Amino acid sequence: MQNRHIPAAAFMSTKTKLRAVAVGGTADEVEAAFYEALQRGDLDALMACWADEDEVFCVHPGGPRLVGAEAIRAAFEHMFANGAIHAMPVRVRRVESLASAVHNVLERIEVLTAEGPRRAFVLATNVYHKTAQGWRMVAHHASPGSVHAPDDEDDAAPQTLH
């Protein structure tokens, strides 16, 4: 008996295909896809990064806690109505284990205002879990912006978990 390999893509729905394209083999690849989708204003690609779970959550700077993919999608759809979000990861600190990863990200955000382009810095925490579908984002929490990047004086100090 001959064993034939049939590509999984042949059996996938459009939504699953989008997830497969957006989500790679590592949490880093999911994060890269997330920020690329923000910069393109691509809602489907952005949502493909999220886990298909009821309790995923997102907190935008100064905003409420959004729970569930539907609430998260609606918030990003509203944000994308004003154009893509020019958020670039400047620095990422990672804590990873077998099935979860936490990325603390310093984001540089560029926005156009009536006075011209402005830059702000946001601290975000992105949490990823390894699911049956691969690595997926389960939480995104972003701080209010600041015109100054936080200094890195504490980088050399030992970190204590509590």
Description of each model-found segment:
Residues 51:
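Helix-to-beta-strand junctions that scaffold the AdoMet/dcAdoMet cofactor pocket
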